[in-house]
Curated annotation (Swiss-Prot):
<dbReference type="InterPro" id="IPR036639">
    <property type="entry name" value="Cyt_c_oxidase_su4_sf"/>
</dbReference>
<feature type="topological domain" description="Mitochondrial matrix">
    <location>
        <begin position="21"/>
        <end position="107"/>
    </location>
</feature>
<keyword id="KW-0812">Transmembrane</keyword>
<protein>
    <recommendedName>
        <fullName>Cytochrome c oxidase polypeptide 5, mitochondrial</fullName>
    </recommendedName>
</protein>
<keyword id="KW-0496">Mitochondrion</keyword>
<dbReference type="GO" id="GO:1902600">
    <property type="term" value="P:proton transmembrane transport"/>
</dbReference>
<keyword id="KW-0472">Membrane</keyword>
<dbReference type="InterPro" id="IPR004203">
    <property type="entry name" value="Cyt_c_oxidase_su4_fam"/>
</dbReference>
<feature type="topological domain" description="Mitochondrial intermembrane">
    <location>
        <begin position="129"/>
        <end position="186"/>
    </location>
</feature>
<feature type="region of interest" description="Disordered">
    <location>
        <begin position="149"/>
        <end position="186"/>
    </location>
</feature>
<dbReference type="GO" id="GO:0016491">
    <property type="term" value="F:oxidoreductase activity"/>
</dbReference>
<keyword id="KW-0809">Transit peptide</keyword>
<comment type="pathway">
    <text>Energy metabolism; oxidative phosphorylation.</text>
</comment>
<dbReference type="GO" id="GO:0005739">
    <property type="term" value="C:mitochondrion"/>
</dbReference>
<dbReference type="GO" id="GO:0006123">
    <property type="term" value="P:mitochondrial electron transport, cytochrome c to oxygen"/>
</dbReference>
<dbReference type="GO" id="GO:0045277">
    <property type="term" value="C:respiratory chain complex IV"/>
</dbReference>
<comment type="subunit">
    <text>Component of the cytochrome c oxidase (complex IV, CIV), a multisubunit enzyme composed of a catalytic core of 3 subunits and seevral supernumerary subunits. The complex exists as a monomer or a dimer and forms supercomplexes (SCs) in the inner mitochondrial membrane with ubiquinol-cytochrome c oxidoreductase (cytochrome b-c1 complex, complex III, CIII).</text>
</comment>
Amino acid sequence: MYLSKIICKKVPMKLLCTRNAATVSAAATNALQKEQPSGEAMIARPRLVDLDKRWGIMSQEEKDGLITDLYARQKQPWTTLSIEEKKAAYWIAFGEHGPRAFSHISQKTVFWGTVAGLTIGVVLFGLIRTQAAPSPRTMTREWQEKSNEYMKENKINPISGEASEGFKGRGQISGGIFSPSEKDKK
């Protein structure tokens, strides 16, 4: 009878102790990993798979733990990192989360922002143009035509310039977009 009481008490106690030991062991392992991540041990694959999809629902403690573990692993040679660890490290560094998260902007906002920017630019250009100094006298068409005649009379640049035989270019006449071209003269 005494033996049956011992067996009955010890068997459930062993089972209970085993369960407690497993729970305590798991909790201690998690605590150790959070306190001192070992850079030599690989990070468990389930923690890394589909990280981009799970990142938004992970708790801040999980994120911090994973970042710390990856940081410790990256101190080792990169040849020892698994492909999942490399992908996770890249995604944490450059993924679409936090300040790099994709923001949805409506097309109307973009359109009206562009219209407002162009309008402000045109108004500023007009205001600056009205306050600008007048163009110098050397920019008038008469002055530039006289400069061409002067260059022909004094044979300035006789090989390829205005004084050369058969010259058909504009010479000193400025060729802005509002200046008449050679076709308009004929």
